[in-house]
UniProtKB/Swiss-Prot annotation:
Gene it is expressed from: hemA
Function per UniProt: Catalyzes the NADPH-dependent reduction of glutamyl-tRNA(Glu) to glutamate 1-semialdehyde (GSA).
Name the UniProt record assigns to this protein: Glutamyl-tRNA reductase
Lineage top rank: taxon: Bacteria
Active site per UniProt: 50 (nucleophile)
Organism: Colwellia psychrerythraea (strain 34H / ATCC BAA-681)
Site (Important for activity): 100
Binding site for substrate: 49-52, 110, 115-117, 121
Length: 422
């Protein structure tokens, strides 16, 4: 029995290749059942995200045969030639597979080192496999242990503590300055991808109120509905800025949208209560001279890049600690798995012995019922049991001796405790 992880990700293939073997969530249950049958394995799970598709298997067969079956199934299921995906596939087996799964869950293999979203995606993959009935004892235990490792890494290292995107860094900086965002009012200028991410982080941090200003209201309204924000036009910014404790801007404008005079008026209306401002745009949305105002804390994208560079360095240090935790926990899982294999062997051997005993006992009972001498029956039973239990070990010892397999012979003598009996 072995554990296998096979996949394709952002490091091994461009999106044009990755999208060819991504799995539609609506068809995942069918895919899991098909894979079980086509690849002839015990258990399977599938993780499919925009950056990676990975298949996790527990199988009994020859590894090379499993590889061939899996590639053939991927070809058939996705209607894509093997030559398109084979160069991008990576394969891990047993402890390497366990180690890989744990690294993925901890964000150590992610495009953004330490990102937490992958753990949620792995939990979803686990739930889908459970619901499809494609997962049993070993894969279930592996996923549970993997989730535990990810939690341990988050708790014991700083892998996720530092912001490594300008959107996340902006919100973190605001949170640090205000000590919490629950009572703050935020004005977001723009409605592009960066501002959407900022809005998402603000919403997750329970910010007091968000107002979105954009040139076209339709796009801003689409975003605002998701986070319960108000929407205004760019022309309305001057009358609303006085209400904002935080202003974060990122538009595609070629000229500044927020000037020094506009901010001065807002500060006067606020009785010079400070405003925290972040300009994420290039070219800048906020005039450089705004930084001269005493009650304004203005940060540009360059200021944040400096913070992010330090944070990335901190994450890399934390990643070294995380790798150590992963290695230790994958060792623990493999020890559990070996124990499970030993237990299976003991159970199988015990069942075999009990079956042999029951057959011989049944014959002995018949002999006793037929009036045969009880001592003779017991002697015959003991003799047959001894011969039965001695047959396999005797054959193994003779085979090892005749084949000159000294190591095997010593091992067998140790197993049967022969030398200590002499």
């Amino acid at each position: 029995m072995s554990i296998v992880a096979v996949g394709i990700n952002h490091k091994t293939a461009p999106v044009a290749v990755r999208e060819k073997i991504s799995f539609n969530p609506d068809k995942l249950s069918i895919a899991l059942q098909e894979m079980l049958n086509a690849v002839q394995c015990r258990e399977v799970a599938i993780l499919s995200t925009c950056n990676r598709t990975e298949l996790y298997l527990v199988q009994d067969g020859d590894f090379d045969v499993t590889q061939q079956r899996l590639i053939k199934w991927l070809e058939s299921f996705h209607n894509v030639p093997a030559s398109t995906i084979l160069p991008s596939l990576y394969w891990h087996k047993d402890q390497q597979a366990v180690n890989h799964m744990m690294r993925v869950a901890c964000g150590l293999d992610s495009l953004v080192l330490g990102e937490p979203q992958i753990l949620g995606q792995m939990k979803q993959a686990y739930s889908q496999a459970k619901a499809a009935g494609s997962m049993s004892l070993i894969m279930d235990r592996l996923f549970q242990r993997t989730f535990g490792v990810a939690k341990q890494v988050r708790t014991e290292t700083e892998i996720g503590a530092s912001a490594v995107s300008v959107a996340f860094a902006s919100v973190n900086l605001a949170k640090h300055i205000f000590g919490g965002l629950e009572k703050t009012k935020v004005l977001l200028v723009g409605a592009g991808e960066t501002i959407e991410l900022v809005a998402k982080h603000l919403y997750e941090n329970n910010v007091g109120k968000i107002t979105v200003a954009n040139r076209t209201l339709a796009r801003a309204e689409n975003m605002a509905t998701k986070i319960g924000a108000d929407v205004i036009t760019l022309a309305q910014i001057p009358e609303h800025m006085c209400n904002a404790d935080i202003v974060i801007s990122s538009t595609g404008s070629t000229l500044p949208i927020i000037g020094k005079g506009m901010v001065e008026q807002a500060l006067a209306s606020r009785k010079h209560q400070p405003i925290f401002m972040v300009d994420l745009a290039v070219p800048r949305d906020i005039e450089e001279q705004v930084s001269e105002l005493e009650d304004v804390f203005l940060y540009t994208v360059d200021d944040l890049q400096g913070i992010i560079a330090k944070n990335i360095a901190n994450r890399r240090k934390a990643a070294v600690q995380a790798e150590s935790i992963v290695n230790s926990q994958s060792d623990n899982f493999m020890a559990w798995l070996r124990g499970l294999n030993t237990q299976d062997t003991v159970i199988s051997y015990r069942k075999q012995c009990l079956d042999n005993r029951d057959v011989l006992l049944e014959k002995a009972f018949i002999q006793l019922k037929n009036g045969k001498n009880s001592e003779a029956v017991l002697a015959e039973l003991a003799n047959k049991l001894t011969n039965k239990f001695m047959h396999a070990p005797t054959s193994a010892l003779q085979s090892a001796a005749q084949g000159g397999e000294l190591d095997k012979l010593i091992y067998l003598r140790d197993i049967f405790n022969i030398d200590s009996q002499e």
